């Protein structure tokens, strides 16, 4: 890619997760284990336990959100309950939140920061960082959705793989200077170092999928440098679907007396409404089996995960030769093309996406209801993030994982142990589509 010299780019290989130890949930206030569906909050204050928070606009009204936000929420048609705690964040305390995929973590910080924001022209008040360009682009779009009735709020997204000069032009113009900045650490740090992006007025510092950024030394270094460029007096919020015991102390170093919010028992971070199966087969049988599944299963959109960019390209080519309308998304594709393909898939112009783990976290495409692990991931947490692409926000979905080696069988056992579930073998007669089609 061009313009790589001025940024740190993160490839799929660098996105390999570290082997995280299984975590356990914080106990409820009365000392009893938190039940499934409970929200457990721990922190410097006395422990609190809440439960489901309504996502109807009437539920949001209880939080005393701005009227402009309530109108946008109504327009978005939110109907499902969310277990993630919005009132906690609105109290302007630091928050460390773990909640499984699809439970509306993004909405928590987007709504909280928009509610608290008093935009000043030419000042950045909110900084949101995430580890991939696609996720940054998506978060920026969420801000656009919810700020539609807040015309004075300006949002911009900055990430690697695009000319940095375009970002500098946005930041050089007071009319376009963003109040909310979303981006990846490498590009943001380059802009801060060049003194093009001033963070001296930041009031909210947010890390989405925080464990991914703080797990990797290079990315953590960028985050730390950016953090040091912000004021001491600010709210820090961090979110992820997986927070190991090892990463939590690292997160807390950025915070002051944070409230820790854990939705559901850590070991039971399964996805309600998502059916999960595996198929044992040899490597040479994968293509035929995939073809059969795509022919016989009903689905709105499917995401197929592979372990490398080369395999993504090869499988995408094969699918298109078999007349399946697919696209491939991975770090080997230019940034402009990746965003173009992401939009094609998001807008339902393509129904099949072949992807590496670069697409495995946080990406929210509501029509995906089938996830296939053509190659099983290396660890249980990556599995959770991948299959979480189907069955977002408590909707129905189906995931099927190919198991073709001893290593795969070991990962399968780790998944079952980590999340205390028994994954059944995919039935010979298939699955009734009414059980996973909304």
From Swiss-Prot:
Keywords: ATP-binding, Helicase, Hydrolase, mRNA processing, mRNA splicing, mRNA transport, Nucleotide-binding, Nucleus, RNA-binding, Spliceosome, Transport. A motif (Q motif) lies at residues 58-86. ATP binds at residues 99-106. It catalyses: ATP + H2O = ADP + phosphate + H(+). Transmembrane segments: none annotated. Coiled coil: none annotated. The Q motif is unique to and characteristic of the DEAD box family of RNA helicases and controls ATP binding and hydrolysis. This is ATP-dependent RNA helicase sub2. It comes from Aspergillus terreus (strain NIH 2624 / FGSC A1156). The gene is sub2.
């Amino acid at each position: 890619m061009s313009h790589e010299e001025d940024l740190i780019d993160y490839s799929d290989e660098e996105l390999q997760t570290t082997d995280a130890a299984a975590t356990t949930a914080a106990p409820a206030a009365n000392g009893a284990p938190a039940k499934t569906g409970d929200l457990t909050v721990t922190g410097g204050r006395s422990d609190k336990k809440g439960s489901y928070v309504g996502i109807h606009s009437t539920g949001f009204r209880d939080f005393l959100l701005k009227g402009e936000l309530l109108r946008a929420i109504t327009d978005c048609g939110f109907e499902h309950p969310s277990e993630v705690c919005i009132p906690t964040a609105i109290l302007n305390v630091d928050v460390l939140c773990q909640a499984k995929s699809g439970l509306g973590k993004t909405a928590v910080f987007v709504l909280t920061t928009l509610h608290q924001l008093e935009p000043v022209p030419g000042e950045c008040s909110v900084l949101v960082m995430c580890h991939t360009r696609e996720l940054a682009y998506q978060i920026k779009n969420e801000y656009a959705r919810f700020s539609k009735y807040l015309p004075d709020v300006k949002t911009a997204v900055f990430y690697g793989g695009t000319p940095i000069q375009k970002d500098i032009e946005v930041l050089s113009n007071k009319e376009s200077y963003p109040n909310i900045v979303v981006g990846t650490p490498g590009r943001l740090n380059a802009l801060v170092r060049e003194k093009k992006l001033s963070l001296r007025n930041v009031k909210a510092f947010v890390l989405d999928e925080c464990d991914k950024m703080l797990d990797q030394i290079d990315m953590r270094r960028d985050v730390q440098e950016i953090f040091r460029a912000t004021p001491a007096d600010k709210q820090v919020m961090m979110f992820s679907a997986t927070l190991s015991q090892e990463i939590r102390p690292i997160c807390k170093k950025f915070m002051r007396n944070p409230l820790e919010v854990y939705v559901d028992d850590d070991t039971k971070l399964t996805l309600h409404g998502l059916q999960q199966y595996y198929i044992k087969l040899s490597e040479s049988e994968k293509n035929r089996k995939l073809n059969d599944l795509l022919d016989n299963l009903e689905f709105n959109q499917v995401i197929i995960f592979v372990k490398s960019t080369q395999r993504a390209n090869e499988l995408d080519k094969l699918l298109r030769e078999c007349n399946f309308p697919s696209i491939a998304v991975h770090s080997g594709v230019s940034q402009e093309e990746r965003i173009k393909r992401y939009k094609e898939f998001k807008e339902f112009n393509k129904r099949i996406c072949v992807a590496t783990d670069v697409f495995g976290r946080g990406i929210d495409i509501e029509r995906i209801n089938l996830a296939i692990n053509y190659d099983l991931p290396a660890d249980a947490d990556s599995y959770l993030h991948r299959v979480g692409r189907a069955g977002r926000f408590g909707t129905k979905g189906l995931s099927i994982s190919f198991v073709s080696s001893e290593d795969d069988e070991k990962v399968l056992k780790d998944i079952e142990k980590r999340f205390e579930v028994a994954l059944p073998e995919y039935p010979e007669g298939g699955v009734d589509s009414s059980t996973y089609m909304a």
